[in-house]
């Protein structure tokens, strides 16, 4: 899976390495969120359950839906550890299943959006990573540190992106982009406007509330969450999802995590520059949005989209696998200067140097490290 890493804030900062394992199976747990209470600086585990984080004299929270949250205090003596998270028992509530009105639950979140979520204008410091594979061969891999300023964490469907969203690319940690050949590899990353849209929660809510049909498949409950699995036809939005999941917080009824799995479909289009026709069929596409607590509300924590797409182009067939990931690593109560902003409607890779080797502090898989070093 993806690897999202920490941002170095001091030249000789103490760095800790953690491995997170399932207490029952002793298997690695990917996507565990680790963040400090005061600064909210954080990171996430990779596919091997490993992470690196700059040590702070504070409580480090380790959180993953489906596991009991663990909190540990760290100081300058903390360097390396293997920690175990206990799985949470989830019990199916059959009574809730047959009476669960998902549309009503979504409407409550829409009506109370500004009470449940932190929507004040601010900069979210983020790590962004894209990884694209073409016919089982890596063709694009890079990671950026960026600042994302949002006016009020509301996606405006009819407004230009630059009006309510500003992004500054601060640095490139590493990059390797193979060739500039004119094929659909340059179109495989989620269209930038849609990428920015799905960073915000309100489009998911709008789609669900206005869905043509919603079929709740099951409802599960534990001490923290009501977990709803559903299919939906979004009708006029030209989008269907299946086996999608929402985690509702039992105390506030806010959405803590939402996963959309898109029903496969075929579309036809033209390549971005040469306008050569192509046909694409996603074999799967899924995107996931998560939130963590911040000042008695919820704040954007991470976003990930993965897709495997079959593309027919110039009488040839290509299989692409693409991943894009955002992870919030810090917060600034500032704005981004106009001269530092990029055009948010352009893909990030257009701003990235094609080849830059990262420093040893970054956690890469063996395959990724070999690709960067080529």
Segments and roles (model prediction):
Residues 16-23, 49, 83, 95:
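A short, amphipathic beta-strand motif
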Residues 202-261:
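Extended beta-strand-rich segments in extracellular/periplasmic secretory proteins, especially
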Residues 40-50:
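Short, acidic Ser/Thr/Gly-rich low-complexity loop/linker segments typical of extracellular
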Residues 82-226, 274-374:
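Surface-exposed, low-complexity/disordered segments
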Residues 61-72:
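A short, solvent-exposed loop/turn motif at the edges and junctions
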Residues 16, 24-38:
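Short, ordered, surface-exposed loop/turn motifs in non-cytosolic proteins
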Residues 1-19, 92:
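Bacterial Sec-dependent N-terminal signal peptides
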Residues 32-36, 60, 97:
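Hydrophobic beta-strand segments
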């Amino acid at each position: 899976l993806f690897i999202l890493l920490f941002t170095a804030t001091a030249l000789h900062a103490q760095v800790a390495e953690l491995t997170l394992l399932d207490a029952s199976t002793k298997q690695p747990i990917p996507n565990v969120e680790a963040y400090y209470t005061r600064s909210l600086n954080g990171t996430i585990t990779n596919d091997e359950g490993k992470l690196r984080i700059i040590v702070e004299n504070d409580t480090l929270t380790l959180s993953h839906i489906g596991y009991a949250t663990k909190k540990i205090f760290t100081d300058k003596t903390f360097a390396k550890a293997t920690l175990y998270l206990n799985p949470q028992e989830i019990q199916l509530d059959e009574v809730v299943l047959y009476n669960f009105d998902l549309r009503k639950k979504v409407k409550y979140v829409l009506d109370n959006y500004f009470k449940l979520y932190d929507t004040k204008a601010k900069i979210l410091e983020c790590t962004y990573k894209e990884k694209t594979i073409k016919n089982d061969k890596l063709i694009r891999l890079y990671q950026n540190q960026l600042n994302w300023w949002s006016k009020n964490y509301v996606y405006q469907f009819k407004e230009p992106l630059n009006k309510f969203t500003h992004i500054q690319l601060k640095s490139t940690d590493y990059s390797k982009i193979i060739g500039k050949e004119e094929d659909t590899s340059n179109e495989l990353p989620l269209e930038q406007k849609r990428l920015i849209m799905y960073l915000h929660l309100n489009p998911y809510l709008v789609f669900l509330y206005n869905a043509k049909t919603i079929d709740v498949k099951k409802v599960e409950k534990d001490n923290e969450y009501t977990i709803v699995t559903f299919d939906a036809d979004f009708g006029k939005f030209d989008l269907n999802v299946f086996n999608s999941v929402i985690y509702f917080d039992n105390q506030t009824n806010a959405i803590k995590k939402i996963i959309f799995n898109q029903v496969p479909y075929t579309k036809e289009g033209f390549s971005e520059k040469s306008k050569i026709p192509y046909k694409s069929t996603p074999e799967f596409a899924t995107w996931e949005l998560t939130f963590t607590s911040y000042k008695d509300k919820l704040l954007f924590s991470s976003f990930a989209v993965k897709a495997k797409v079959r593309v027919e182009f110039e009488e040839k067939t290509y299989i692409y696998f693409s991943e894009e990931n955002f992870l919030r690593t810090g917060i600034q109560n500032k704005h981004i200067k106009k001269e530092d902003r990029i055009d948010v409607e352009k893909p990030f890779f257009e701003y990235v140097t094609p080849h830059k080797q990262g420093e040893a502090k970054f956690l890469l898989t063996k395959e990724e490290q070999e690709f960067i070093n080529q």
